[in-house]
């Protein structure tokens, strides 16, 4: 098979996914790695003449090899998803007539119970942040936004000031067809105003309204820095278990479901593609240990 041509199709597909479907950069990187693994596997098929000869048996063989390499079911499911959307793209563009992945289903797996923060833990995090400094106001706003909006860390860090509607307490995350409106708390609104004023005063001519969360150099806060500051505040708050930016998103999801929010509305707020992903919050609130934590949120 002409693998140079195959790799050309992959590049065209990745370009299409990033700039037409507006998938995130991290998603593109993951898909690229998955398709590179597929290319490597197919290169060992001696009798493969061209791309139209790729069969369901070959795709199943690829998945079997991944299983033998002890790839987890969740990762295996994601890799199959990457392969499926690639071949759908090829079929849509009439490069192939038959999609070899059409009859192949993703493996079922048990959804892990995500970490849910209690109101006590969130209050402890608030209490250890020094809001007398610009960086402290920034960090307090980060905590309030993550907790009350349910956005991802990537969405948080990409925010500019113009996407905020303070009067309606809503903001727009994402771009193009993948954009959505989410809402935030009154606390987040107040810390947004205080932080922006402090940022203007601190950075003066280096102040940039297109980047909300900045470091001491007035450049965009990185994902690594975000994780470090959450780790630092968790340690100061004497929270012994590991938490991450996603802990706030999971807390938001479970909290909304426990208060009767329609699951399809929650799906839209969280930006989930598949309703099954959102349904995990229905499952976790059934667990007694989680219910105990959620009860604290109501106090």
Describe the function of each predicted region.
Residues 1-299:
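Conserved catalytic core of the tyrosine transesterase superfamily
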């Amino acid at each position: 098979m002409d693998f140079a041509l195959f790799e050309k199709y992959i590049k065209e597909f990745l370009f299409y996914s990033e700039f037409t479907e507006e998938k995130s950069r991290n998603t593109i990187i993951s898909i690229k790695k998955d398709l590179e693994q597929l290319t490597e596997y197919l290169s060992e098929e001696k009798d493969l003449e061209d791309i139209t000869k790729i069969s369901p048996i070959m795709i199943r063989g690829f998945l079997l090899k991944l299983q033998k390499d002890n790839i987890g079911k969740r990762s295996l499911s994601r890799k199959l998803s990457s392969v499926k959307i690639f071949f759908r793209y090829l079929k849509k563009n009439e490069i192939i007539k038959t999609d070899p992945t059409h009859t192949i289903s993703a493996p079922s797996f048990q959804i892990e119970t995500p970490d849910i923060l209690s109101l006590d833990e969130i209050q402890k995090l608030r209490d250890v942040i020094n809001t007398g400094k610009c960086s402290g106001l920034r960090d307090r706003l980060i905590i309030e936004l993550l907790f009350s909006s349910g956005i991802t860390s990537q969405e948080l860090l990409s925010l500019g000031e113009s996407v905020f509607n303070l009067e309606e307490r809503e903001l727009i995350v994402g771009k193009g067809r993948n954009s959505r409106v989410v809402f935030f708390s009154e606390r987040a609104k107040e810390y947004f105003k205080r932080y922006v004023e402090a940022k203007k005063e601190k950075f003066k001519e280096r102040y940039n309204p297109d980047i909300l969360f900045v470091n001491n150099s007035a450049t965009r806060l990185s994902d690594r820095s975000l994780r470090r500051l959450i780790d630092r505040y968790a340690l100061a708050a004497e929270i012994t278990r590991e938490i991450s930016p996603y802990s706030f998103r999971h807390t938001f999801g479970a909290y909304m479901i426990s208060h009767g929010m329609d699951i399809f509305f929650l799906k839209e707020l969280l930006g989930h593609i598949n309703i099954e992903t959102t349904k995990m919050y229905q499952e976790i609130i059934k667990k007694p240990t989680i219910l105990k934590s959620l009860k604290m949120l109501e106090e």
